[in-house]
Design a protein with these regions (language model features):
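Sec/Tat-exported extracytoplasmic proteins
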Residues: 59, 66, 84-91, 119, ...
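Solvent-exposed, polar/charged alpha-helical surfaces in well-ordered, non-transmembrane soluble domains
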Residues: 67, 74, 78-85, 110-117, ...
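Short, internal strand/loop/helix patches
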Residues: 113-142
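Envelope-exposed proteins and targeting segments
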Residues: 36-38, 60, 96-98, 140
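Short active-site neighborhood of thiol/selenol oxidoreductases, capturing the structured segment around
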Residues: 50-74, 79-80, 98
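Thiol-based oxidoreductase modules, predominantly thioredoxin-like and allied folds used
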Residues: 92-107, 122-133
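N-terminal "domain-start" segment that seeds a small globular fold
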Residues: 22-53, 78
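Secretory targeting signatures
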Residues: 1-23
């Protein structure tokens, strides 16, 4: 009797596991049409100029952070790293990541390089002169 009960329970679990579940639920905001951003030049973590036009045609995920941020910025960076890995082949070909400091007075390219390297982040970490950043944030509606 217990053998039949075990087989029945196992069959029910197996069948339940094979049934189709709910579709994935999207919790974000669908931005359609995409927001156009004017071309802008910043400085990357290697001290080289970086132009947004280099990423033309790609979806760009942008995080505004600062390296001395003790709480949410490292979490945002870790989440972006996770997303970049989950994207697989789409990452780099169709989707790009950028991190832009909101503290260019302290976050120069050397500090941005160190921040990215310590966390194993492989996308551009950008900085600029403070007056240029305010121009960019105005254009980006930040």
């Amino acid at each position: 009797m217990s053998r039949v009960l075990t087989l029945l329970v196992a069959s029910c679990l197996l069948i339940a596991g094979c049934l189709e579940g709910d579709e994935d639920i999207f919790y974000g905001d669908d931005i359609n049409p995409p927001v156009a951003v004017e071309d802008f030049i910043l400085v990357d973590e290697n001290g080289d100029y970086f132009s947004f036009s280099e990423l033309e045609g790609k979806v760009i995920v942008v995080a505004f952070l600062f390296t001395r941020c003790p709480d949410i910025c490292p979490v945002v960076s870790a989440n972006m790293n996770y997303v970049s890995q989950e994207l697989g082949d789409l990452y780099g070909t169709e989707v790009a990541m950028l991190s832009i400091t909101v503290d260019p007075w302290r976050d120069n390219s050397t500090i941005m390089h160190s921040y990215a390297e310590q966390r194993g982040l492989d996308w551009p970490h950008l900085t600029t002169a403070s007056e240029d950043l305010s121009d960019f944030t105005d254009l980006s509606d930040v």
